[in-house]
């Protein structure tokens, strides 16, 4: 048992995407026992036998043995076709893990079909002996399993009655098997690197070597069985009874004609990761994308928050190995501001270039290209200046295809002399003899010096070479004829802030080739492009501006049963993560050494095993969903948040030893958190309103208007406020009081407001006035002398404070362009705003600069400011409430100083 430390957890319980990083079917109930029927066992034997056949192929290198094995492969395929009562998804997983599969099963079957007519006499006897061995094995199985005889007999009757009755289905199933082999080779290309780079050129085996091959076949089959058992045990948590019930033969019978064979494996893998709750949406997305050769240009993904839109789309695109780029428009817009357009351009090009580089490296290893390098990441600059630059770089990335490289390579190889080619063949032969017999069967080049005795083998090897070249073309088509995908998440933020960028991205197919008179891009064909827009609600038609409303994939809300299934599967992550965040020093969580999915909770003398914890968790999830689903079904993130934070409160009485972990105490545990649930679900749609009212942003008594400035900056702001509110004629009183060394004399009590006083007079008094720079400094000096007994010395510190206030926009230069004021309109007999409405800090660009620039000295990096002479007109841009709070903090009677 190993203790889990608090810092070992990487899961954020507040984020739905992070908590679901593990496989969606990662947990199988400890109380569930996997029940397998004889039919289920028979299917497992068939899949394992087919895998053993592939293992045997890698152990032998003769053409005769390959013909023999093809017959076994055909028998296993026929048995798979006939046994369509149930299809075990575990068999697909074993096929994924089998790294010794051939690259192109169609080509091998074609070759073997041609060789069947010539070599019937060679392998008929062997097949008969194999059948006898199979019969002996079946007899032994019948003796050992007497209870299942009737089921097996019934299943064999079904096989005999339904044999080849549905030829269309058998053809489709064969094509699907071949397609699965191709998909698995592409998915497992990283594992097949060494095998694809090596080409075996072996001699035909003599009769004395037959015993060696048979023993090697048996050893390989045993090793493959052991490896498959280990892998099935290791990855057994990916599959449970629910998957086996959902994925049946009838399910695949309807599924195979509707889904392109090239992406069938990616579809199944995405279902394993994301769950069957989004099967309908994934099927709709596949119908729109097709085989990714010519997808729809723009696709819209819509759904409420927490419904798995981004997770499903990104996982499916990754599993198809298509070059793609992902941009979160929310982060790009609100983190970059004005430069959001350049950030989005750079993110798209950077992600796309990295994926294209990975695609090219995979293509090189598949086709054995070593003398050529291509790095698309070097085409992407660090800063994308404008839209034209973005489209030109994107055109270069999408117009690259390695066809010319291969053609040049083949022509140079054909020009070589025969002696050089023979020497190269000998070198290859020596290398392959030293490395062993571990490469693919399609790459077996059995070239011999004994041409008279082995003419048939030599011809077959030549045909294999041709097939390998066609396989190269297949991978070229597979990789470079597919389209590129751009995923734009939270697109509504891009529409609000940069509608021109949204317009360009949705019409990227038109702009990528530039103007019609650009001859450099005329004859270059580019790859297809698909834009996937992810949003919460549909965009209005006028946003698309002539572009038809794109087809939509709706991610509707999860049902209550779906929510329960998802939370059941989050047991390993959410259950213990929420307990680790709970502040309890006595609580300790352990996991089992041989199985890290089984946990044990210990607190003082209370010990809870994994089965008990899981049973309590399932009952807790049922209670939470039944109570709060109606309130939080539109936001799954909130439901996850409630579930994770209520769990420690729910299980606390059991951990404290107050209640026993039995079924009779479940009602007491529910009553313990019933009050918390009612509070959490009360006004769930507006539960932040009271927090905002009581927050620092809306409460006058808190720190809302407090500005973190120095002492002299605050004094300068108060002096600027007095200069903007009082007329210059009233400054004499302040100067006289300062010269005499006394305090300010309080003004006489103001007269009451005159009823006949016009609104224009009141507005003129309330509007802040501009003031000169020398007047601002003099009033500030008066405040320092009278209230703090200091003098304002214009040193470097004061200059720096003045520079900071101007650059922050608190004090700005007075001009008709950046000053908003009310003026009288003689035509309308009223008042109106003059200039820009609002703060000059937000509406002018001349006030933005770095704090390192100084307005008192000219530097190369400084922005263009007006000269700050003593009579420069300035204006204050700070709210009056903020000034009053500063005056209260500094104990300055502001109302008494305003005349």
Swiss-Prot record:
Binding site for ATP: 303-310
Protein's name according to its UniProt entry: Origin recognition complex subunit 5
Known EC number: 3.6.4.-
Disordered, as annotated region: 27-47, 100-166, 194-238, 409-469
Biological process according to GO: DNA replication initiation
Major localization class: nucleus
Membrane-spanning parts: none
Biased composition (Acidic residues): 105-160
InterPro entries: ORC5 (IPR020796), ORC5_C (IPR047088), ORC5_lid (IPR048866), P-loop_NTPase (IPR027417)
Biased composition, class Low complexity, residue ranges: 207-218, 455-469
Gene Ontology CC: nuclear origin of replication recognition complex; nuclear pre-replicative complex; nucleus
GO molecular function, one term: ATP binding
Location(s) in or outside the cell: Nucleus
Primary gene name: ORC5
Family of this protein: Belongs to the ORC5 family.
Organism for this UniProt entry: Plasmodium falciparum (isolate 3D7)
């Amino acid at each position: 048992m190993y203790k889990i430390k608090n810092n070992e957890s990487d899961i954020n319980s507040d984020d739905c995407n992070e908590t679901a990083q593990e496989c969606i079917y990662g947990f199988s109930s400890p109380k569930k026992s996997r029940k397998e029927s004889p039919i289920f066992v028979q299917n497992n034997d068939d899949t394992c036998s087919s895998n053993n056949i592939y293992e045997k192929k890698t152990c032998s290198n003769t053409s005769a043995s390959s013909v023999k094995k093809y017959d076994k492969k055909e028998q296993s395929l026929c048995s798979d076709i006939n046994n369509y009562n149930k299809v075990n998804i575990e068999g697909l997983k074993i096929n994924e893990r089998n790294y010794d599969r051939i690259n192109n099963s169609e080509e091998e079957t074609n070759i073997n079909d041609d060789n069947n007519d010539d070599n019937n006499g060679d392998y008929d006897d062997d097949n008969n002996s194999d059948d006898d061995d199979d019969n002996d094995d079946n007899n032994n199985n019948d003796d050992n399993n007497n209870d299942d005889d009737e089921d097996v007999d019934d299943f064999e009757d079904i096989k005999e009655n339904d044999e080849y009755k549905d030829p269309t289905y058998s053809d489709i199933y064969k094509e699907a098997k071949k397609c699965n082999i191709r998909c698995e080779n592409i998915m497992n290309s990283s594992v097949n690197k060494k095998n694809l780079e090596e080409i075996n050129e072996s001699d035909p085996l003599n009769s004395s070597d037959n015993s060696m091959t048979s023993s090697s076949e048996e050893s390989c089959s045993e090793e493959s069985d052991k490896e498959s058992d280990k892998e099935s045990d290791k990855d057994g948590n990916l599959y449970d009874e629910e998957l086996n019930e959902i994925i049946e033969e009838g399910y695949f019978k309807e599924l195979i004609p509707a889904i392109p064979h090239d992406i069938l494996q990616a579809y199944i893998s995405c279902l394993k990761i994301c769950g069957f709750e989004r099967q309908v949406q994934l099927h709709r997305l596949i119908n729109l994308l097709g085989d990714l050769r010519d997808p729809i240009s723009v696709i819209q993904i819509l759904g409420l928050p927490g419904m798995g839109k981004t997770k499903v789309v990104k996982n499916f695109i990754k599993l198809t190995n298509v070059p793609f780029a992902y941009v979160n428009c929310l982060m790009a817009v609100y983190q970059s501001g004005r430069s959001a357009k350049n950030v989005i351009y750079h993110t798209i090009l950077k992600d796309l270039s990295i994926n294209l580089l990975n695609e090219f490296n995979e293509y090189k290893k598949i086709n054995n290209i070593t003398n050529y390098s291509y790095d698309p990441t070097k085409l992407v600059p660090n800063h994308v200046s404008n839209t034209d630059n973005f489209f030109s770089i994107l055109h270069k990335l999408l117009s690259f295809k390695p066809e010319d490289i291969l053609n040049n390579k083949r022509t140079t190889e054909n020009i070589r002399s025969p002696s050089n080619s023979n020497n190269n063949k000998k070198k290859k032969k020596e290398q392959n003899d030293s490395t062993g017999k571990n490469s693919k069967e399609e790459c077996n080049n059995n070239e011999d010096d004994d041409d008279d005795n082995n003419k048939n083998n030599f011809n077959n090897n030549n045909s294999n070479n041709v097939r390998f070249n066609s396989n190269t073309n297949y991978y070229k088509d597979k990789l470079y004829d597919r389209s590129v995908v751009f995923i734009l998440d939270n697109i509504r933020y891009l529409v609000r802030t940069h509608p021109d960028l949204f317009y360009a991205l949705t019409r990227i197919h038109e702009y990528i080739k530039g103007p019609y008179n650009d001859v450099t891009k005329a004859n270059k064909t580019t790859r297809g492009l698909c834009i996937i827009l992810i949003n919460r609600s549909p965009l209005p038609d006028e946003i698309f501006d002539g572009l038809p409303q794109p087809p939509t994939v709706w991610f509707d809300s999860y049902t209550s049963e779906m929510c329960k299934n998802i939370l059941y599967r989050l047991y390993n992550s959410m259950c213990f993560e929420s307990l680790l965040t709970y502040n309890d020093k006595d609580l300790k969580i352990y996991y089992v050494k041989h199985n890290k999915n089984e946990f044990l909770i210990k607190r003082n003398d209370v010990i809870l095993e994994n089965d008990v914890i899981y049973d309590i968790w399932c009952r807790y999830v049922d209670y939470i969903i039944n109570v709060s689903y109606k309130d939080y079904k539109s936001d799954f993130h909130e439901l996850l948040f409630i579930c994770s934070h209520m769990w420690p409160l729910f299980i606390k009485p059991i951990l404290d030893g107050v209640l026993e972990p039995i079924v009779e105490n479940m009602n007491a545990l529910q009553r313990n958190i019933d009050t918390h649930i009612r509070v959490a679900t009360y006004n769930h749609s507006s539960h932040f309103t009271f927090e905002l009212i009581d927050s620092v942003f809306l409460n006058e008594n808190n720190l809302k208007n407090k500005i973190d400035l120095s002492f002299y900056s605050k004094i300068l702001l108060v002096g600027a406020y007095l200069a903007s509110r009082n007329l210059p004629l009233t400054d004499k009183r302040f100067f006289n009081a300062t010269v005499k060394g006394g305090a300010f004399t309080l003004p006489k009590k103001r007269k009451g407001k005159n009823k006949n006083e016009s609104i224009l007079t009141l507005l003129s008094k309330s509007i802040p006035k501009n003031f000169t720079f020398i007047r601002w400094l003099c009033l500030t000096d008066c405040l320092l002398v009278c209230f703090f007994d200091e003098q304002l010395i214009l040193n470097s510190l004061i200059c720096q404070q003045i520079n900071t206030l101007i650059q922050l926009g608190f004090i700005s230069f007075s001009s008709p362009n950046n000053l908003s004021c009310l003026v009288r309109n003689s035509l309308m007999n009223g008042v109106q705003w003059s200039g820009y409405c609002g703060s000059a800090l937000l509406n002018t660009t001349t006030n933005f600069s770095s704090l390192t620039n100084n307005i008192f000295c000219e530097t190369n990096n400084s922005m263009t400011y007006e000269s700050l002479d003593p009579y420069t007109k300035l204006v204050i841009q700070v709210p009056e409430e903020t000034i009053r709070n500063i005056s209260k903090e500094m104990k300055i009677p502001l109302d008494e100083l305003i005349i």
